[in-house]
Regions:
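Alpha-helical transmembrane segments in multi-pass membrane proteins
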Residues: 12-62
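Juxtamembrane helix-loop-helix connectors linking adjacent transmembrane helices
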Residues: 32-38, 66-135, 153, 222, ...
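Hydrophobic core of alpha-helical transmembrane segments in multi-pass integral membrane proteins
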Residues: 17-25, 48-55, 86-95, 233-254
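Small-polar-interrupted transmembrane alpha-helices in polytopic inner-membrane proteins
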Residues: 157-172, 206
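C-terminal membrane module of polytopic membrane proteins
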Residues: 206-263
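Membrane-interface helix/loop boundary segments of multi-pass membrane proteins
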Residues: 138-163, 190-197
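Functionally important transmembrane alpha-helices
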Residues: 17, 21-26, 165, 177-230
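Interfacial transmembrane-helix boundary/kink motif in multi-pass membrane proteins
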Residues: 1-18, 62-95, 153, 229-236, ...
């Protein structure tokens, strides 16, 4: 039984890696390995995994709906929750980036430097397509839609959230991105556990990435990377705004209640 549980959690990750690695390898052969098209290859290879991940997520979701029923919630409530989830993820992402940049980790991590060069090697619109549309859908379906849910079935939502966050961090390989992805993943897991909507994690993930792209392209928040009073103060304010947004999100749920993990 335990082996079956482990397999149920990890085989979607293996499938994700096999498909994305195969497509990325094929694109390397066809298009070459220049930084200018790295995000294009990332978008295509991640996009190739979405049909399979969606099918697995939908299968789990249908079983759950048969057991617990389908809960209908008004569109207005969803819009409010989406705004709050995006605010929480966006501000928390800004603060995380700032606090990590204030440490020596960014300078000493060669893996992060390489990943950063690849990420920002192409045009802004390709960065937006890959990291704000395709990748958030694929990664949230996998980690918050499938892994979290499957672990939660036998270990509870707290353990499911921790596992999904840690595994999400591990796929980013280098230490800097592991810390950022694991902590942001934990927040996204809380959003899914509280709201029962994976789509809100997708929106939050996309928002955090979009802000990262915007601030890098514009340089508008460069001061907040520095361990100065202004940089630290701004980052603390971002955390505070994120916490208020999360509390407001929970408050909207207390009015209506929610069911089991759903869409």
């Amino acid at each position: 039984m335990k082996k079956n549980r482990v397999w149920a959690v990890f085989y979607p990750i293996f499938v994700y890696y096999l498909i994305s690695a195969f497509v990325f390898f094929a694109l390397n052969i066809l298009l070459g390995e220049t930084q200018e098209i790295y995000m294009l290859k990332q978008a295509v290879s991640s996009g190739a995994t979405i049909p399979v991940l969606f099918a697995l997520w939908k299968q789990d979701n249908e079983v759950e709906r048969v057991v617990y029923g389908k809960e209908k919630r008004p569109l207005g409530q969803y819009v409010v929750q989406a705004v709050l989830a995006c605010t929480a993820a966006g501000t928390f992402g800004v603060a995380l980036n700032n606090f990590i940049a204030m440490t020596p980790l960014v300078q000493v991590s060669e893996g992060f430097q390489t990943a950063n060069e690849n990420f920002f090697g192409g045009g802004v619109w390709m960065q937006v397509l890959a990291s704000c549309v395709v990748v958030p859908v694929a990664e949230e379906l996998l980690f918050r839609g499938i892994v979290l849910k499957r672990v939660a079935l036998f270990a509870g939502e707290t353990i499911g959230s921790i596992y999904s966050a840690l595994l999400f961090g591990l796929i980013h390989v280098n230490l800097v991105q592991f810390i950022y992805a694991a902590l942001l993943g934990a927040l996204l897991a809380v959003i899914v556990v509280k709201t029962k909507r994976v789509s809100l994690a997708v929106l939050g993930h996309a928002t955090a990435n979009l802000i990262a792209i915007f601030r890098t392209a514009s340089g508008v928040l460069d001061f907040s990377y520095q361990p100065t009073l202004a940089g630290i103060g701004f980052s603390v304010v971002m955390v505070a705004i994120g916490m208020v947004a999360m509390l407001a999100l929970v408050h909207t749920l207390q009015k209506t209640g929610t069911g089991k993990l759903a869409s």
